[in-house]
Structures are given as structure tokens and as C-alpha cells.
């Protein structure tokens, strides 16, 4: 709990799961009995959200150079100096929800609750 200008502001933990069903199970296990919002669940001291699987993907080669749109053995290997990423169209809305929650002033601790394997870690890392 934090005091600001005579008001009590509750600091919150943010839990980020890989998908909605896992987020609901985490919320149940952690006794987060808050209201369900659009893309997250919030209680007095916690927020639970999810990624819906991958929210971000690597850009296709033609984003780096239009000549790479047509596949050719001559252009391999293709190793950019810096990788480019883009949001996946179907889940842009959820990406922006997670982004907004990550940047809230009242969020003081972030728990990554994606799968423990390589893929789960990668899903969160790109967010």
C-alpha cells in the first residue's frame, strides 16, 4: 500500500499467462477474485492477463529487402544485423492491453506465467 496526497493507492502484482484459460486457473489458484475486464482480470492487489499465444512474430525477409520476396537459394543464408518484429493482426488488441498493463504506475511486480519451456519464454520475451 502506498500513500499519495492523502489517498491510499494499492500497488499491484501483474501476472502474465500464455493464454486465457491458464490465466483464469492462475487467478483461481491465487484467489484473485476481481472483476473480469476486457483482456484481463483485476482485483484490489493483482492483475492477471494473457498473451493468447504468440502476439509478435519475426518479419518476413521482404520487409528487410523487397528483392527477398521471391525465394532463391542465392540469397541464403539470410542473416540480418538486427531482427525486425511485427504484431500479429488477429491479436493486436490483446498486445496493446498487455502493453498498457505493463506500463501502469500501480504495477510494481511482474510475474511471467508462460510455459517454462523455450516457446513460453519466447512468447513473453517478445512482448
Where are these regions (language model features)?
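Intrinsically disordered, low-complexity regulatory segments
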Residues: 2-127
Amino acid at each position: 500500500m502506498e500513500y499519495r496526497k492523502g489517498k491510499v493507492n494499492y500497488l499491484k502484482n501483474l501476472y502474465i499467462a500464455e493464454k486465457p484459460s491458464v490465466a483464469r486457473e492462475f487467478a483461481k489458484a491465487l484467489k484473485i477474485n476481481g472483476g473480469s475486464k476486457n483482456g484481463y482480470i483485476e482485483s484490489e492487489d493483482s492483475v492477471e492477463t494473457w498473451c493468447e499465444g504468440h502476439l509478435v512474430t519475426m518479419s518476413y525477409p521482404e520487409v528487410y529487402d523487397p528483392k527477398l520476396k521471391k525465394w532463391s537459394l542465392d540469397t541464403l543464408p539470410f542473416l540480418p544485423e538486427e531482427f525486425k518484429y511485427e504484431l500479429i493482426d488477429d491479436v493486436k488488441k490483446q498486445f496493446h492491453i498487455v502493453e498498457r498493463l505493463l506500463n501502469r504506475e500501480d504495477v510494481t511486480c511482474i510475474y511471467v506465467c508462460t510455459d517454462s519451456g523455450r516457446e513460453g519464454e519466447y512468447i513473453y520475451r517478445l512482448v
